[in-house]
Amino acid sequence: MWKLLLVALAFALADAQFQPGKVYRYSYDAFSISGLPEPGVNRAGLSGEMKIEIHGHTHNQATLKITQVNLKYFLGPWPSDSFYPLTAGYDHFIQQLEVPVRFDYSAGRIGDIYAPPQVTDTAVNIVRGILNLFQLSLKKNQQTFELQETGVEGICQTTYVVQEGYRTNEMAVVKTKDLNNCDHKVYKTMGTAYAERCPTCQKMNKNLRSTAVYNYAIFDEPSGYIIKSAHSEEIQQLSVFDIKEGNVVIESRQKLILEGIQSAPAASQAASLQNRGGLMYKFPSSAITKMSSLFVTKGKNLESEIHTVLKHLVENNQLSVHEDAPAKFLRLTAFLRNVDAGVLQSIWHKLHQQKDYRRWILDAVPAMATSEALLFLKRTLASEQLTSAEATQIVYSTLSNQQATRESLSYARELLHTSFIRNRPILRKTAVLGYGSLVFRYCANTVSCPDELLQPLHDLLSQSSDRADEEEIVLALKALGNAGQPNSIKKIQRFLPGQGKSLDEYSTRVQAEAIMALRNIAKRDPRKVQEIVLPIFLNVAIKSELRIRSCIVFFESKPSVALVSMVAVRLRREPNLQVASFVYSQMRSLSRSSNPEFRDVAAACSVAIKMLGSKLDRLGCRYSKAVHVDTFNARTMAGVSADYFRINSPSGPLPRAVAAKIRGQGMGYASDIVEFGLRAEGLQELLYRGSQEQDAYGTALDRQTLLRSGQARSHVSSIHDTLRKLSDWKSVPEERPLASGYVKVHGQEVVFAELDKKMMQRISQLWHSARSHHAAAQEQIRAVVSKLEQGMDVLLTKGYVVSEVRYMQPVCIGIPMDLNLLVSGVTTNRANLHASFSQSLPADMKLADLLATNIELRVAATTSMSQHAVAIMGLTTDLAKAGMQTHYKTSAGLGVNGKIEMNARESNFKASLKPFQQKTVVVLSTMESIVFVRDPSGSRILPVLPPKMTLDKGLISQQQQQPHHQQQPHQHGQDQARAAYQRPWASHEFSPAEQKQIHDIMTARPVMRRKQHCSKSAALSSKVCFSARLRNAAFIRNALLYKITGDYVSKVYVQPTSSKAQIQKVELELQAGPQAAEKVIRMVELVAKASKKSKKNSTITEEGVGETIISQLKKILSSDKDKDAKKPPGSSSSSSSSSSSSSSSSSSDKSGKKTPRQGSTVNLAAKRASKKQRGKDSSSSSSSSSSSSDSSKSPHKHGGAKRQHAGHGAPHLGPQSHSSSSSSSSSSSSSSASKSFSTVKPPMTRKPRPARSSSSSSSSDSSSSSSSSSSSSSSSSSSSSSSSESKSLEWLAVKDVNQSAFYNFKYVPQRKPQTSRRHTPASSSSSSSSSSSSSSSSSSSDSDMTVSAESFEKHSKPKVVIVLRAVRADGKQQGLQTTLYYGLTSNGLPKAKIVAVELSDLSVWKLCAKFRLSAHMKAKAAIGWGKNCQQYRAMLEASTGNLQSHPAARVDIKWGRLPSSLQRAKNALLENKAPVIASKLEMEIMPKKNQKHQVSVILAAMTPRRMNIIVKLPKVTYFQQGILLPFTFPSPRFWDRPEGSQSDSLPAQIASAFSGIVQDPVASACELNEQSLTTFNGAFFNYDMPESCYHVLAQECSSRPPFIVLIKLDSERRISLELQLDDKKVKIVSRNDIRVDGEKVPLRRLSQKNQYGFLVLDAGVHLLLKYKDLRVSFNSSSVQVWVPSSLKGQTCGLCGRNDDELVTEMRMPNLEVAKDFTSFAHSWIAPDETCGGACALSRQTVHKESTSVISGSRENCYSTEPIMRCPATCSASRSVPVSVAMHCLPAESEAISLAMSEGRPFSLSGKSEDLVTEMEAHVSCVA
């Protein structure tokens, strides 16, 4: 090293130094200016002129003295304008600059700098900028060389080029610096700790590029080199978007010229000098938080300023947000940052009693981001001056925004131990998580985080672990995850799966949190995290959820291609499909990423996907999935990505855990924006089991009551005895929380909550407490009512800083460049409430008294918000600031002034609202780009774009440039100021081409663009308008940055359409109950009066129409008793109404009138068609049955089926025109009357078109399927003795699908079940008659769905009426009336209709919507709107049925004429979007024309877990087979209800269907016989069962299992069964030997409802035991067990865990996985005194001698798990080989051998496995 240094010194030139006793005098000019790079636009900057004297003291030291300081600023068009002096407030700063400063100088390099302590850092930094010009590293005989050189900006890459001058003693040196290539760069950041650098993004586009060029002229003197002149130019270029889209620059220049060298005596030395460091720039300690580019705080009385700003905020934000409120709030924040804790505490003590001031102070303290804010918070909490709500808000906000320093971390630690926080759990969680985030921000820019900062979190983790407090462990792990430091890895590893004593030492929840805590650590040390999580993923013995979570962390750490390929190779033989599906889906989605951040991972995953192939791509949504989608825009260099993780549970469709994350990329950085997560493992069990457990008959059993009895205790103890007999039993840890969720912001967890038993108990306690304190609740209600009567005034304001991002780095002149983004906002909500009551309320008022009165509430409310975003690029110092600034302001506000009336007794609600009476701006957005200069004398600003500029006039006129809302700028017109300083680089330096470009730009005028669009509302006599005005810099360059630079104003406003207010108020009235009809009749009477008034001028007479309306409305208002009294016996109300309407129709027809006007409720064309049809059908009305039969056959005779497909128009959605005769039975007449009334000719059609019904459209399919339906029903009736249990087993079976039949798409709708009868000729005719009548009723059902029918209104009272009315000054009716009718069909199923009409009597617009639910889960909905509900029509029909004998559901959407907008949307969806969606879903296509104007979707359940889908569009059919469902399709028994059965209500049926899906009712089955075993997961094993020993076949794995199924094989090879069911012990040997609690009970007694709570049914060969959800089928040779899917993963025993995990199928009671099946089966033997009698088998540790492979010595090896062996007095008659793990000890170790010989118990469980060998396990023993 020393040799290299000597060689370097040998090549160095003579030292550049200052000779002692000489003074070197220089003139120095420097400036820095910011703005757009093009000439002609306005820029802003700072400049300085001064004289410099350098006195040489020794060869290595000199003194610099500054004189004649002249500070200036620039504000105007560049380069034509000049600099102007800064005068006011700079005297003290200039005095500091003129203080002499000493510095070390050796071999051309600047060393340490010494200055008096009173000299500020800003002055010393300017001295550094001057000395930076003297930093030279020249080498002898080298003209070009590179090195890392120290400068003001840091230690950066520097290139030297040395050229000889014209004279012998002169040389020219050019030095360039790449400021983006630095070993140590000087910069400061704020608000970017959570942002991660994106190296690949920076390679594509460097957002901040910096470079500097220095030109030197040097004299070569014998005494050394002297700098004659030096010029520097530095460019800082910021590209917000892609570099081609424009950039903003900061240009800095320095000029140093030698004026002379004189001899002078040595200068006097300062009394005390302090070492201020080297040449690199030094930021003040609080510069990042206290140096704001927006405000100048130096020299101000800050306490007075704070009071002034607070007063402005309080007084001007009472009703709505003031437009300057966000800026004022930022000013308040800036002032508070510059005061100490004492001043802040003084302000609080003065104002905290005033609630308005209190709110603003508490909002501003978190935005301070200084340690004084934490100190203030600590003192305020200690004095308990905050409420819990205020404390939670301010603690979270303060810790989230806090600038991380050692001082703030110390205060935060003290904050955690305050009693106020410790005693509030929610607040404590917030504080602990916030402390972890604060540590993360502090250590973000350090190599290693100090241990003392993490010690509080490590202590919390250790202490909670010692106490086994799971909640505290989770909190500590989450806080360490927020901190994200590699120092915590060892602490976290203890809780990772596979790292402790066993895999299940901690609960799954704790292990999952430990894995996820590594996510932030992976950002700092990805390789270490990969080494930890990869073994977890590869370990198949670990639970699938934990392996999946490790995979999430693994891919977030951005692994290499090699590691991803390793995962892919392991995935080829992955036995766990949940893990395989998740990892494959994650790699597949990542491989499609186009975001540069994921470029390397995407390439690695693309290779891995090719290795795996498409085998795993066929796994459906039943399995866990990961989805990653992203987008990236190259122009803006910004993107967004989203991740969705779903970890499925084998126990049902509800996932075990879900998480979603949104991540953003921009400016070369990436950050997690927000993340939500939910874990709900216990939620499905809660939904399935409910609050009470059901016995075999559905009766609720109270388990606690049973356990209180002595008999129950004895049997519970019996269960525990059985558990103790199992070797090393460990109950599976219960997942205590039912659900838990969390929210992360910027990768930091800010809040998490859990719903567990404790939380449920708290909620229950609060509920019971509220009920028990009923009097207190009534008192609170009375207090609120009293306040409302007096009038309540509520004001809520909130000020906030959304984002504050700053980046500061020095420029060459020694002042910092500041990039700043600030987003702040203020919201105000104010409401004035005043209530009045129709009657005075009693003093002891109750809620019932309040509801019995008519309440009138007057409301005057306003809500408003204003948001202010500021982006700055400029220069900032304590005194002066200059730069370019863009403001974006948005304000929105809305006021409400109205009245609410409510009468609960009469079910009436009415609200009125006053409309806008004048122009009201709702949303206002402005954007302004300016250049500014701020100093203590004021603020000067100019727009970036001058209105017009020429070269002849050097300056923009004051009238054009001066802003109207700022202080008076410096007078540019003063000639002496203009001539004070002229640029040394004048315009003659530009080439002619450059001057022409300058002239073109400066003489151009930016264009003002305007745009306005309004949408008028005639109903409200107002219009909503959007207007915009834009003036940008796109005329200079067509780039994105220039398009958003300039001035922009847009607003959304509401304005009345006329000067006179036509609408006085808008009313909304809702009436329900019996009074609803009154609202309808009032509206109709108005229409009737208007129609009578217009009769005189109308050519169309309407005789009898008004009388008909009034008679119908009177009938509506008549009571139900009157209608029942008038109703003849045996007739229905519908028939009487039908006949009434029919007679009315005929009388109207006889009058010979023309079609009535469109506002009436009767259509005469329908009546004529009905009359004509009745006359045509009267000849064939001999009997109702024949008439009905003929009616059903008529469509086929007249070619109706052909017209179904040949029609070229819209399908007719109404009934058939061939209705049955009016002389039929009452139901028939009702049907025909309904049809005749509803058959309305649409207004847009000229010629009537034959109608079709849904029954006729599928008549061929129906007839072809009727025979198969009847045959299937007959076969089912012949085997009616089979139980419902067998039906469910048939449903579980997987049937083969006939592929050719599937492509026919023959869907058979569900039919009514036929009554079982003998098939005789008579019955056959009867059957046909029934079929025809069924068809007729089907047609009638279709006719009910015609939207134009009015029969519903005639037969039913309206249930709800909603009237939206505009009260006009001219008294005209304007608004909308909506009427809701609902009732029940003849089958007791719901039907409903909604009718909406306009209130204007001149309007014919109407909307009709009908809904009906028919039997067998068939629903129809139709809607029509427009002219008399007939202009536009659509219908939806949903039904259940069969597709090739598989249960299916079908949804049909039909439409007629549609509005043009809907028509375009429909065409775009069907023709453009549908093929794309089908292609993404990989659906097959069949070019097949289907019905026009109809879309059909058929879903068929081929198996309980697989579904086929068919989508029929008018021109094509899409289908897909074998779609794997995440849930189990409900059993067909759900809709196979007999017609006459007592079915549940509709809500109960829907709840049952949903419950069937959520509960996933497909049971898991396990079967065992004497030779083999098939587990719940379907694994098959051959097993030679030991005799006379009980095996645990199946049980629920918990500390108190509700059931245990035990089996035993006797000496005759017969199986006996024993069950322990909660409080019962059942033993079954045969059908004649059944014992309950030792008492023999006959089978017939157990086959019916009994006191034991279970059933035993005789199923022929088998006995079937039913207990709750458990089913056990038994005979002497085999046993079958069915458990519900709610026990997925919660069973154990020989039948396995029931978790679909075949690799871990052989889990023993100690949760270890057995080496072979025999060892697994033997581990579940419960040996007792009956296990072999005197020669009973028992578990014994076996011994084997072995020789050590390494040392060759003898060892004694013992089995780690005992195996089945006979006693020493007996010998084995049968044995089987088993694999045994051995633990070996030296031969001289005799402790275990002695224990074995003495028969003392010992265990080697958990010891290391040194040897695995095969040994004999005994099966039976003989004496």
Swiss-Prot record:
Example of a GO biological process term: response to estradiol
What tissues harbor this protein?
Produced by the liver, secreted into the blood and then sequestered by receptor mediated endocytosis into growing oocytes, where it is generally cleaved, giving rise to the respective yolk components lipovitellins 1 and 2.
Extent of Basic residues compositional bias: 1194-1206
Posttranslational mods: What corresponds to phosvitin in other species is lost during maturation of vitellogenin to lipovitellin.
Positions carrying Pyrrolidone carboxylic acid are Q17
Q: Where do the record's glycosylation annotations fall on this chain?
A: N1097, N1298, N1675
A molecular function annotated in GO for this UniProt entry is: lipid transporter activity
**Keywords assigned:** Disulfide bond, Glycoprotein, Phosphoprotein, Pyrrolidone carboxylic acid, Signal, Storage protein
Q: Look up the signal peptide feature and give its range.
A: 1-14
Question: Where in this chain does the record put each Vitellogenin domain?
Answer: 18-658
Task: Provide the residue span(s) of the region labelled Disordered.
Answer: 953-986, 1119-1289, 1308-1351
Query: What cystine linkages occur within this chain?
Result: C1566-C1695, C1589-C1731
Q: Which InterPro entries does the record associate with it?
A: Lipid_transp_b-sht_shell, Lipovitellin_superhlx_dom, Vitellinogen_b-sht_N, Vitellinogen_b-sht_shell, Vitellinogen_b-sht_shell_sf, Vitellinogen_open_b-sht, Vitellinogen_open_b-sht_sub1, Vitellogenin/Apolipophorin
Phosphoprotein: is it a keyword of this entry?
yes
The UniProt regions of compositional bias labelled Low complexity, in chain numbering, are: 958-976, 1128-1149, 1178-1192, 1217-1238, 1253-1286, 1323-1344
Q: What induces it?
A: By steroids (estrogen).
Q: Identify the Gene3D superfamilies for this entry.
A: Lipovitellin, beta-sheet shell regions, chain A (2.30.230.10), Lipovitellin-phosvitin complex, chain A, domain 4 (2.20.80.10), Lipovitellin. Chain A, domain 3 (2.20.50.20), Vitellinogen, beta-sheet shell domain (2.20.90.10), Vitellinogen, superhelical (1.25.10.20)
The UniProt record lists the VWFD domain at 1564-1732
Summary of the function given for this chain in its UniProt record:
Precursor of the major egg-yolk proteins that are sources of nutrients during early development of oviparous organisms.
This chain's protein is named Vitellogenin
Q: Which organism is it from?
A: Ichthyomyzon unicuspis (Silver lamprey)
